[in-house]
Amino acid sequence: MQRSPLEKASVVSKLFFSWTRPILKKGYRQRLELSDIYQIPSADSADNLSEKLEREWDRELASKKNPKLINALRRCFFWRFMFYGILLYLGEVTKAVQPLLLGRIIASYDPDNKTERSIAIYLGIGLCLLFIVRTLLLHPAIFGLHHIGMQMRIAMFSLIYKKTLKLSSRVLDKISIGQLVSLLSNNLNKFDEGLALAHFVWIAPLQVALLMGLIWELLQASVFCGLGFLIVLALFQAGLGRMMMKYRDQRAGKINERLVITSEMIENIQSVKAYCWEEAMEKMIENLRQTELKLTRKAAYVRYFNSSAFFFSGFFVVFLSVLPYALIKGIILRKIFTTISFCIVLRMAVTRQFPWAVQTWYDSLGAINKIQDFLQKQEYKTLEYNLTTTEVVMENVTAFWEEGFGELFEKAKQSNNNRKTSNGHDNLFFSNFSLLGTPVLKDINFKIERGQLLAVAGSTGAGKTSLLMMIMGELEPSEGKIKHSGRISFCSQFSWIMPGTIKENIIFGVSYDEYRYRSVIKACQLEEDISKFAEKDNIVLGEGGITLSGGQRARISLARAVYKDADLYLLDSPFGYLDVLTEKEIFESCVCKLMANKTRILVTSKMEHLKKADKILILHEGSSYFYGTFSELQNLRPDFSSKLMGYDSFDQFSSERRNSILTETLRRFSLEGDAPVSWTETKKQSFKQTGEFGEKRKNSILNSINSIRKFSIVHKTPLQMNGIEEDSDEPSERRLSLIPDSEQGEAILPRISVINTGPALQVRRRQSVLNMMTHSVNQGQSVHRKTTASTRKVSLAPQANLTELDIYSRRLSQETGLEISEEINEEDLKECFFDDMESIPAVTTWNTYLRYITLHKSLIFVLIWCLVIFLAEVAASLVVLWLLGNTSFQDKGNSTYSRNNSYAVIITNTSSYYVFYIYVGVADTLLALGFFRGLPLVHTLITVSKILHHKMLHSVLQAPMSTLNTLKAGGILNRFSKDIAILDDLLPLTIFDFIQLLLIVIGAIAVVSVLQPYIFLATVPVIAAFILLRAYFLQTSQQLKQLESAGRSPIFTHLVTSLKGLWTLRAFGRQPYFETLFHKALNLHTANWFLYLSTLRWFQMRIEMIFVIFFIAVTFISILTTGEGEGTVGIILTLAMNIMSTLQWAVNSSIDVDSLMRSVSRVFKFIDMPTEGKPTKSTKAYKNGQLSKVMIIENSHVKKDDIWPSGGQMTIKDLTAKYIEGGNAILENISFSISPGQRVGLLGRTGSGKSTLLSAFLRLLNTEGEIQIDGVSWDSVTLQQWRKAFGVIPQKVFIFTGTFRKNLDPYEQWSDQEVWKVADEVGLRSVIEQFPGKLDFVLVDGGCVLSHGHKQLMCLARSVLSKAKILLLDEPSAHLDPVTYQIIRRALKQAFADCTVILCEHRIEAMLECQQFLVIEENKVRQYDSIQKLLNEKSLFQQAISHSDRVKLFPHRNSSKYKSRPQIASLKEETEEEVQETRL
């Protein structure tokens, strides 16, 4: 970054913001880079500001029982805040005084008062000086208040982050990431931009009092008619606002529901294509969109009327103020024009400035209270350690994760026991509470000496991780004692990678020791991986390790723990993502050799690890099931494998036990405090099973291992499904969390490809921070996108006499939408994370505008209609101008107002009714035309938004995976959430505002030019200057906003990264270092934001200066060239003030339109994506010259003779696959053949290309070569026909929000009887029947109430229903317990006995049924043979098998005597799905 010119700028340069000219000039000429941004002043650095506020907050905590954060803020910022407030008040006073001078200038043209004509020139100078003074006061005041707001935000940002690092784990378990992000974005943004409005809470009342006094001198008591109208208008708009909120709350549910399905579609786009569900998903989303648009239109119409009411109130407030006085006493022109100017200022103060100020204070104080409560939460307390201790001892330790744990569930039980099903039975969700009040650890005892290895094992939820947390001090024991030295190193069960190099991640702030570093690298099997990078271990890893696989991240995390020289090493399931061979080598070389002299506690379920451990501790439901050696375990607990590792069959449990299991599963997702609801209602509600979890902790069942991102939406009211929605008295609440998840090779936050080895965004319930910390981070990280842009407040339509501050206020209202409820109005996704999915030009191109306008055939006609209506309004206004300009020549004998002022009288006794009728007629005309002229435009623009959404959705679903691989999941979801919300809400009214303002300016210029042609000559260069200035500023401002967005992303990225690795940070004591990194991220964002504020102020001030110059010219031209007639001067000066303020706002509005049209540009980019290819060969060459019915069975009535494929034979020739066109080959020259009905297993190490081969079979990649199925080539049929030949069980199971039946048969081709039959075949029937509504039970959050095994059975049922002849299985047993695995094996034998099966597996025993095996190494086929031949040859396959005890199963593979598995073969490896369900 460069040094800021502000440091050496003069006072004049600072006053006029001239120091920003270099960056403006550079941005206009070329693309700005981060290096072009100026350094921030030292006073704005996060270090200084946070230290200042932290000092005052500590002082507040120490001095009072009830500390107030606002007091600390007051001591830091109050005096500067008040100084700029006084400047702002003085600027507003000048605005109130201007009408007085205008009235005196008009009075000087009174024919009977020629003595004052000579002072008109001086009055004009005074009026112009007022404008100059106001400009010099207003802009520094606004900038200063912005600056203070920015400093307050930075200081509180830092304070919140520091507090986050200190929070206890119990507190972290009660709050969600969404709440933290909201605290840092939504709440603090209120200070950043809203502070400029805060002073109007006292300025506006003073201004109203001053104006009322001045108008009283003109109109006396009739002024209260105008004031009363403004008050009624404010109440009317408040009523419209409530109506708009009602529609908005209803619409929020529909938006959430659509985005739920959309995000699930994006997350699982590869599965959607594999299942050929494009049409079903498109229809489902479009149906939801239709319902949403109905409410969108209603809300838009209400906002439009609200906007129109304010715009046209200016005419009526003058009309009602003047008319009573005029009818009684008559009135002169001077009073009319003076009153018009006064009423404009009065209207803004009453209906805008004061309500906005009150709202700002309300929101700000609410935000301060929330932050204050957060800062007072319980902090993490380190345990007292004995540094001389060499042993680790735990005596009679009992612990709870939450105090009052039992009370929480007692309350839930009491609340939900009142629920009854429709037939009177107890609600299934809460029929059993066996786990209420259970401690996470109970009476734990063990002792290990220095250098010993303790292996901790146990079933899911046994408390293994909690045991390590208690040793680390993260969990405080309620009973018992813990004794160890305190020098701890820790490796989490989910690898955590911080942004930086591999070396920095391993060393992690510890002093560098070359020999130790190399030894650790070698022991953790990282040498080969590091050698592949050009930068070796200095390669910079993205957030979460974007360039690494899951196994590499796991080994780096282990290396970090091993590198630190500690007395005690806590290793929490470090081998979960390693293949058998790598795991074996690392365990031997690292855990057993390199760390042989260290005390180690290893959480594992591997039998090999238990055998080599000095001591074994097996936990069961938080209690110690066994403690001793392995030989003692075999003698004392021979049944430990079946009892603790889940080997019992669910179907063999008693009915009470089955009910308890299901109850516990469902209980975790039940809605606390819901009103009673019947199951018949439940099946009509798509989200009844989830909801707001309140502030109390609920146990978590997290989603599967391969989720990359989770899109969390929690809604207090049930969302609509099938057009039915339950009424609720509570407002809808929308919360979105940033809950990082993971997938191989993927990055944290937005920098993730849509498809790599997993999906992108998954809808799920809100998670606590603790759950996020204990969630998988090995697979890519999740970003929870906030989707509330569509619910923001939309500003009211501008009026003709806005000041720059008024314009800013309206811009603030439009952009930020300050709402009382943070949950409803959490900032949009892009407010927190930069969406850099593609490069959009800094300024929207004309082609985008043209394409947008021509998208709907009616839009052009609607624009012409608006122009015609405007001309009619101009004609009506000319009637008033004619009246004002000509009534001064009435016969003075008709005057009763003044005997000597005949030319000044316009209202007389004889003409009063005539004039009254004219005013009423004009008012009615303006009211009718103004209220309804924009409705067709708003309606049509929403229709255009509907068309764009439909085209974009269709384009995404039909786009090839090679294109989607180049996109980021966050970018896709942003198009459907943020950009569609802009198209629905902001763009229609913003375009209407701009068109309206533009026409007003044109009309006013035309009128003034007719009255005084010389003024037209002054107008032309001014308009040209505005246009040039806009073009000059727009290039730089848009780039600065992009850089600011890019600078915002690291702040929230760092927050999420820190929280995910918080236990590691504390174990290593790296909190100060991460605070420094956070301050750097804040300073980077501050540099961009401060420069944007400065350049914006430069632009606004230059507009104001041009306006002042123009007004000076108009004033003196009108004074010097106008002869008799005060009416002409009054019209010219009044309209001149209106022209420039309106033109000023029109320029700003055009900038807003350009900014919003960038959303249209991004949508067009998606619409223009290529579509998947069509057949390139004729189908007539097959089967005797004719391919009979190239189709898959899609209903049960198709004759077998007409079915393709009929046998399932596959021939693969020279298959080469790439993720993207022109990229590196990920499969090369693959050739082999599969006989009909044969079962083929794919073998190879992680990353060898097994899953990629299955994707290539489905034509999901860029492929070359040829594949034939039963003689039909893949380029001879459509993609839909080809993919329907396969049944698929993917690695990432796709369960979308909908009923069981919809998930099994989305096209609704099969009857309930047929679905039940298939469910019975695959073992799903007993599961589905446990749920209320059975097939109509609505699954949400990716099927969160189902185990991963049940989800796999769902996929198996889909394949059975498809009647596919070829079945592709990608790691189907990766997360299965033995029981579910046996169900799948049985179903495969029965339902797919005559089908071709291709199986990709890591577990050797899962592939015993395969006849042939394809070994893939380095993206090529190395071997393709039977299992016996592979074992007899030297190969990687034989090497891996030799290291597994399961090899003894192979001799029995074909033996009829083999009936059962050995009782103790292996402890089941705890998979991520199970870990996610762990109740710590």
Swiss-Prot record:
A lipid is attached at residues 524, 1395 (S-palmitoyl cysteine). It is an enzyme of class 5 (isomerase). It comes from the Eukaryota. The chain crosses the membrane at residues 78-98, 123-146, 196-216, 223-243, 299-319, 340-358, 859-879, 919-939, 991-1011, 1014-1034, 1096-1116, 1131-1151. Residues 1386-1480 are annotated as: Interaction with GORASP2. A motif (PDZ-binding) lies at residues 1478-1480. Residues 1452-1480 are annotated as: Disordered. ATP 2 binds at residues 1219, 1244-1251. There is a cross-link at residue 688 (Glycyl lysine isopeptide (Lys-Gly) (interchain with G-Cter in ubiquitin)). Its main location: membrane. Residues 1-77, 147-195, 244-298, 359-858, 940-990, 1035-1095, 1152-1480 are cytoplasmic. The modification Phosphoserine is found at residues 549, 660, 670, 686, 700, 712, 737, 753, 768, 790, 795, 813, 1444, 1456. Glycans are attached at residues 894, 900, 909. Keywords: ATP-binding, Cell membrane, Chloride, Chloride channel, Endoplasmic reticulum, Endosome, Glycoprotein, Ion channel, Ion transport, Isomerase, Isopeptide bond, Lipoprotein, Membrane, Nucleotide-binding, Nucleus, Palmitate, Phosphoprotein, Repeat, Transmembrane, Transmembrane helix, Transport, Ubl conjugation. Residues 1470-1480 have a biased composition (Acidic residues). Residues 81-365, 859-1155 form the ABC transmembrane type-1 domain. InterPro entries: AAA+_ATPase, ABC1_TM_dom, ABC1_TM_sf, ABC_transporter-like_ATP-bd, ABC_transporter-like_CS, ABC_transporter_C-like, CFTR/ABCC7, CFTR1_ATP-bd_dom1. It catalyses: ATP + H2O + closed Cl(-) channel = ADP + phosphate + open Cl(-) channel; chloride(in) = chloride(out); hydrogencarbonate(in) = hydrogencarbonate(out); ATP + H2O = ADP + phosphate + H(+). Residues 99-122, 217-222, 320-339, 880-918, 1012-1013, 1117-1130 are extracellular. Residues 423-646, 1210-1443 form the ABC transporter domain. Binds and hydrolyzes ATP via the two cytoplasmic ABC transporter nucleotide-binding domains. The two ATP-binding domains interact with each other, forming a head-to-tail dimer. Normal ATPase activity requires interaction between the two domains. The first ABC transporter nucleotide-binding domain has no ATPase activity by itself. Monomer; does not require oligomerization for channel activity. May form oligomers in the membrane. Interacts with SLC26A3, SLC26A6 and NHERF1. Interacts with SHANK2. Interacts with MYO6. Interacts (via C-terminus) with GOPC (via PDZ domain); this promotes CFTR internalization and thereby decreases channel activity. Interacts with SLC4A7 through NHERF1. Found in a complex with MYO5B and RAB11A. Interacts with ANO1. Interacts with SLC26A8. Interacts with AHCYL1; the interaction increases CFTR activity. Interacts with CSE1L. Belongs to the ABC transporter superfamily. ABCC family. CFTR transporter (TC 3.A.1.202) subfamily. This is Cystic fibrosis transmembrane conductance regulator. It comes from Plecturocebus moloch (Dusky titi monkey).
